[in-house]
A protein has these predicted regions:
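Substrate-binding pocket helix/loop in short-chain dehydrogenase/reductase
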Residues: 96-97, 104-109
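Conserved NAD(P)H cofactor-binding loop of Rossmann-fold oxidoreductase domains
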Residues: 88-93
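C-terminal helical subdomain
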Residues: 180, 196-234
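Residue(s) in the substrate-gating loop at a strand-loop-helix junction
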Residues: 140
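Active-site helix of classical SDR
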Residues: 120, 156
Length: 254
């Protein structure tokens, strides 16, 4: 059996689920990780009803650093080669900074930043030994703009973008691509559960984003932004004065 796998975090719903379905459709074996075991089982069942691949499930809360150690150890002990790691798991919150519980803010940092860093730290050496691999870190269009009322979330995604690009320069000499992929607003439960107000945004279909991400990963694109409208936001943030971008983005968030 082919022991090469694509590992996807946050795979029980939304973008992660769509990515799992897309990679499965292309014959990729999967390691799916999320907190909710029942939802993972449903994703697996639905995929295997139409795809002939191998799927491993791990029910872990990646905001717990020990869980990441257990995940990596399980992959090693089962001789699963992670040829592609997709760090998709993340959480967010919208509101005035001190109106959001500090614990919630710290959880955003723990999952969106610390867990992602540790996943890279543990799995990159294996890819380095193999002389090949792809790490795809899912950032966000908010990485380009300091969104008021999403201060910690947007800042966490700015970290992901900067970290990923720096990491790519370090590891490309080993045959490893570290890709940054930026979705915009997507029609998933993530945005509703985070309390984001989306009345001014036309959200993308997660399946459409998954197809885009698959192509970007297979073509080893180092940096990708989904949808033309999101590319315009990134360009707008780049060419206009920082003060102007900050003020306008705050009005957009209200």
């Amino acid at each position: 059996m082919n022991n090469n796998y694509t590992l996807i975090t946050g795979a029980s719903s939304g973008i992660g689920k769509a990515l799992a379905e897309e990679f499965a459709a292309h014959g990729k074996n999967l390691i799916l990780v999320a907190r909710n075991k029942e939802k993972l089982e449903t994703v697996k069942h639905n995929i295997l009803s139409v795809c002939n691949i191998d799927i491993k499930l791990f029910s872990f809360d990646l905001s717990d650093p020990v869980a990441i150690d257990k995940l990596h150890s399980a992959c090693k002990s089962n001789q699963l080669t992670v040829e592609c790691l997709i760090n998709n798991a993340g959480i967010g919150a919208e509101g005035e900074f001190t109106d959001i519980a500090l614990e919630k803010q710290q959880n955003i940092i723990q999952l969106n930043i610390s867990a992602l860093v540790k996943m890279c730290y543990l799995f990159l050496p294996d890819m380095k030994s193999n002389g090949n691999g792809i790490v795809a870190n899912i950032a966000s269009t908010t990485a380009f703009v300091p969104f008021a009322y999403e201060a910690v979330y947007s800042s966490s995604k700015a970290f992901v973008m900067s970290f990923s690009q720096a990491l790519h320069e370090e590891y490309k000499k080993y045959g490893i691509t570290v890709a940054t992929i930026c979705p915009g607003v997507t029609n998933t439960d993530f945005f509703a559960s985070a309390g984001f107000r989306l009345q001014n945004f036309n959200g993308a279909d997660p399946k459409d984003f998954a197809k885009f991400a698959y192509r970007a990963i297979q073509n080893r694109k180092v940096f990708s932004i989904h949808r033309f409208s999101n590319k315009l936001i990134a360009l707008w943030a780049k060419i206009f004065p920082r003060n102007f971008v900050r003020i306008v983005s705050a009005k957009m968030s209200k």
